[in-house]
Design a protein with these regions (language model features):
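Acidic, surface-exposed loops and disordered segments
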Residues: 2-211
Length: 211
């Protein structure tokens, strides 16, 4: 085979490999985007769980997801309490009006704001935004891993904050935002369609269609 022929063959192979790589990369990117959106749209609150345990590696993934949340000035004003003890889970369920399902969960994650980490020059309440973002990350991560979870509110209710602090021995500079029971779903409720165009305003209040 002439040198020019060999060169043409090699060039054709190289172009083919490049095309395949680009296609695979584009497919992966599209799949990733679709997976993220699908995960958001199909997540729903799960309040009933099987007896299957959540292993340590899966738990760490949830906590890493929480800590990957956006945070003002990178304060990271959060702490996370993991509760597996059955007596403590029962006590949380007994103490909080909307967290009864915690008694049947393999574990709960208590998302807390740390007032000593929250910088007053940013905002005395910026921890609320940061820990809320962390909570949503945990909920989405749980759903993506085949787990079920639900956000049960603690802050800003003084009696609930006091109850959680008492059960878990939490100091006064730590404010529990919420308790997230986590486990493998024993129910499959359909996600609610919450899309309402009337809640969107374009350029001026009350304009619900983009011109």
């Amino acid at each position: 085979m002439k040198i020019s022929g060999i060169f043409n063959v090699l060039l054709a192979v190289a172009v083919g490999v490049l095309a395949v790589n680009l296609y695979n990369r584009e497919s992966a990117e599209n799949k990733g985007g679709q997976t993220a959106i699908e995960n958001i749209m199909t997540r729903t609150s799960i309040r009933s769980y099987t007896d299957k345990a959540v292993d340590a590696a899966t738990l760490e993934t949830l906590l890493r997801a929480g800590m990957a949340a956006p945070t003002a000035k990178n304060q990271q004003p959060w702490d996370f309490m993991v509760v597996r003890d059955r007596a403590l889970l029962q006590s949380l369920a007994d103490s909080l009006p909307y967290a009864k399902m915690t008694a049947g969960a393999p574990l709960a994650i208590v998302v807390c704001g740390n007032l000593q980490k929250s910088l007053p020059r940013v905002s005395a309440s910026s921890w609320i935004m940061d820990t809320s973002a962390a909570t949503e990350n945990i909920l989405l991560a749980a759903h993506s891993l085949g787990l079920g979870a639900v956000w049960t509110g603690v802050h800003p209710y003084p009696e609930r904050i006091k109850a959680v602090r008492t059960v878990l021995g939490i100091p006064s500079h730590i404010v529990p935002l919420c308790v997230i029971p986590v486990g493998y779903p024993a129910e499959t409720p359909a996600p609610k369609d919450k899309w309402k165009p009337e809640n969107v305003h374009y350029n001026s209040w009350g304009v619900h269609t983009e011109q």
